[in-house]
């Protein structure tokens, strides 16, 4: 568990209600632009028959799309157990339950307990982790071919929004915090294990970075 919060604080933010909202949005609208950018990049690098490791996959929408495009199997690493009901429902509806393994583990703290995969994905995860370098370095070590992650765009609008959300959590005595980490420093951490940046998508809300080995 990252040092920014205790387990109760984390569970209260990534609650069952949050999971239902994410699941409902995916059913109605499909992938967000950032999630679509992740899926498209991973697919462009060769997804057929690939194994995927998604760190913090939540309700599984990115994984489902990668499996539909030809990935063989996905391992999802999670900290919050509040996603389980919605994730199981989406996987069942997609007929993909047997192709996904869900584990509860923090890869940055226990990297040796996680097997490598062809593709490693982190969507809207780095912003929730205080030690981004440790997380991204661990993710890169586990990527045989491709690493792709999203992060909040480092602009004034996002800084105001994140600051307001963190301020509210401070007032309610919730120690969970979100972060807008330095984009270039994140790239440096991701490249530390022999990977090279081959794709970047910039947007007002979420940026996407893709690396290959």
What are these regions (language model features)?
Residues 1-45, 49-58:
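Conserved class I S-adenosyl-L-methionine
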Residues 109-114:
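Short conserved loop adjoining the S-adenosyl-L-methionine
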Residues 144-153:
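Conserved beta-strand signature within the Rossmann-like core of class I S-adenosyl-L-methionine
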Residues 119-131:
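A short SAM/SAH-binding and catalytic strip from SAM-dependent methyltransferases
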Residues 176-194:
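Short alpha-helix
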Residues 59-100, 104:
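Class I SAM-dependent methyltransferase SAM/SAH-binding core
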Residues 129-139:
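A short, conserved alpha-helix within the catalytic core of class I
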């Amino acid at each position: 568990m990252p040092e920014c919060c205790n387990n109760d604080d984390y569970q209260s933010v990534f609650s069952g209600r949050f999971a239902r909202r994410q699941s409902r949005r995916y059913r109605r609208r499909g992938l967000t632009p950032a999630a679509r950018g992740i899926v498209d990049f991973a697919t462009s690098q060769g997804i057929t028959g690939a194994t995927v490791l998604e760190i913090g996959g939540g309700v599984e929408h990115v994984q489902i799309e990668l499996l539909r495009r030809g990935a063989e199997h996905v391992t999802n690493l999670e900290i919050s157990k509040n996603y389980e009901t919605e994730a199981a429902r989406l996987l069942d509806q997609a007929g993909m339950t047997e192709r996904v393994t869900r584990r509860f583990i923090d890869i940055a703290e226990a990297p040796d307990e996680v097997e490598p995969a062809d593709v490693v994905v982190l969507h809207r995860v780095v912003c929730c982790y205080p030690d981004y370098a440790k997380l991204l370095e661990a993710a890169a070590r586990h990527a045989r071919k491709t690493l792709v992650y999203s992060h909040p765009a480092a602009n004034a609008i996002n800084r105001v929004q994140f600051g307001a959300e963190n301020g509210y959590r401070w007032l309610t005595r919730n120690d969970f915090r979100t972060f807008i980490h330095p984009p270039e420093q994140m790239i440096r951490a991701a490249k530390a294990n022999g990977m090279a940046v081959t794709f970047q998508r910039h947007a007002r809300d979420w940026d996407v970075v893709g690396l290959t080995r």
